[in-house]
From Swiss-Prot:
Catalysed conversion reaction: a plastoquinone + NADH + (n+1) H(+)(in) = a plastoquinol + NAD(+) + n H(+)(out); a plastoquinone + NADPH + (n+1) H(+)(in) = a plastoquinol + NADP(+) + n H(+)(out)
Subunit relationships: NDH is composed of at least 16 different subunits, 5 of which are encoded in the nucleus.
GO biological process per UniProt: aerobic respiration; photosynthesis, light reaction
Similarity annotation: Belongs to the complex I subunit 1 family.
Record organism: Chlorokybus atmophyticus (Soil alga)
The protein, known as: NAD(P)H-quinone oxidoreductase subunit 1, chloroplastic
Record keyword Chloroplast present: yes
Length: 360
């Protein structure tokens, strides 16, 4: 049984009960979902930064942050405030427009992609029929911002980092898209909500990860490369390029690159959950014979918690990968994308299409 909560109707009725007119209540609802997405993604980034510090400390047998709040949970907030109040320096020979627009062009598309991420049947800002392809298309804009930042800095290390970012994005965007296309072919839909609902019938046994194991592994590798996580962080390799395209940046512009990186990591983990692990659905199927407002609220929180739990499992694996695997060379990175992942993901798509024609 699908437990559906209509948040818009509940919100408007609640304000009408307080004496606010229905038109004003409907107008107040319009910016609320976008505001919730921005605040939620920002809080998710703070949690990821804290987890990265604590997990890396555990891998290296250290304690990690412990003074800024209990268990150091306020350390990411302190780091963010430090970057906000630092001086914003623009190199004298840099292209001011490219240098300034680059970080914004990296962050804004990633936040826009959250509009199609569902946390429940009606817990999605925009349930569009091309939700999956909207994510792929909008996330393809970020490498342009990285290239602009590297070119506009008028620095050889920044320019090389921007070129590497563009080459890496092109190399791994194609296998990632082919893996997603196989899921869409299997689900007969491009809507993120319908893809999750298609996996909800048999609990954990209905998840796409069992029907697409090759695509799942290929998707994870390509997603790590798209997020520029170790062992694929060639665009900002410290030993080779100082800080890559970030070399000349300081203050809040420098912080925007980190925000974009972690927001993109959370977004990729959420889409891995949606496409392969059933999204908000529980591993164990259950049905409730009646439906009340309290049960609807409980179902909404259960869906959000289930989605985030699965997503943070991927984030934990990516953090563990960063601190346990060495960085690959740029030629190895491109060989992995073009000579290994591309043929495998293409073969997986052809196999999925063949099985679809044979058994459906």
């Amino acid at each position: 049984m699908l437990l559906i909560i209509d948040l818009q109707t509940a919100f408007i009725n609640w304000f009408v009960g307080l004496g606010v007119s229905k038109d004003i209540s409907a107008a107040l609802w319009i910016p609320l979902p976008i505001l919730v997405v921005i605040v939620g993604a920002t809080i998710g980034v703070l949690v990821i930064v804290w987890l990265e510090r604590k997990i890396s400390a555990g891998v290296q047998q250290r304690i990690g942050p412990e003074f800024a709040g209990p268990l150091g949970v306020l350390q990411p907030l302190a780091d963010g405030l430090k970057l906000v109040f630092k001086e914003d320096i623009i190199p004298s020979k840099a292209d001011i427009w490219l240098f300034t627009l680059g970080p914004a062009l990296v962050v804004i598309p990633v936040f826009l992609a959250y509009l199609v991420v569902p946390f429940g049947h009606d817990l999605v800002v925009a349930d569009i029929s091309l939700g999956v392809f909207f994510w792929i298309a909008i996330s393809s804009i970020a490498p342009i911002g990285l290239l602009m930042s590297g070119y506009g800095s008028n620095n050889k290390y920044s320019f090389l980092g921007g070129l590497r970012a563009a080459a890496q994005a092109i190399s791994y965007e194609i296998p990632l898209s082919l893996c997603v296309l196989a899921i869409c072919l299997l689900s007969n839909s491009l809507s993120t909500v319908e893809i999750v609902e298609q996996q909800s019938a048999y609990g954990i046994l209905g998840w796409n990860v069992w029907r697409q194991p090759i695509g799942f592994v290929s998707f994870l590798i390509a997603a790590l490369a798209e997020c520029e996580r170790l062992p694929f962080d060639l665009p900002e390799a410290e030993e080779e390029l100082v800080a890559g395209y970030q070399t000349e940046y300081s203050g809040m512009k420098f912080g925007l690159f980190y925000v974009g990186s972690y927001v993109n990591l959370l977004l990729s983990s959420l889409f891995a959950t949606i496409l392969y692990l059933g999204g908000w659905t529980s591993p164990i199927t259950f049905s409730i014979p009646f439906q009340t407002s309290e049960i609807e609220i409980f179902a909404a929180f259960l869906g959000i918690g289930m989605t985030l739990l699965k997503a943070y499992l991927f984030i934990f694996l990516s953090i563990l990968t960063r601190w346990t695997l060495p960085r690959v060379r740029i030629d190895q990175l491109l060989d992995l994308g073009w000579k290994f992942l591309l043929p495998i993901s293409l073969g997986n798509l052809l196999l999925t299409a063949s099985l679809r024609l044979a058994f459906y």
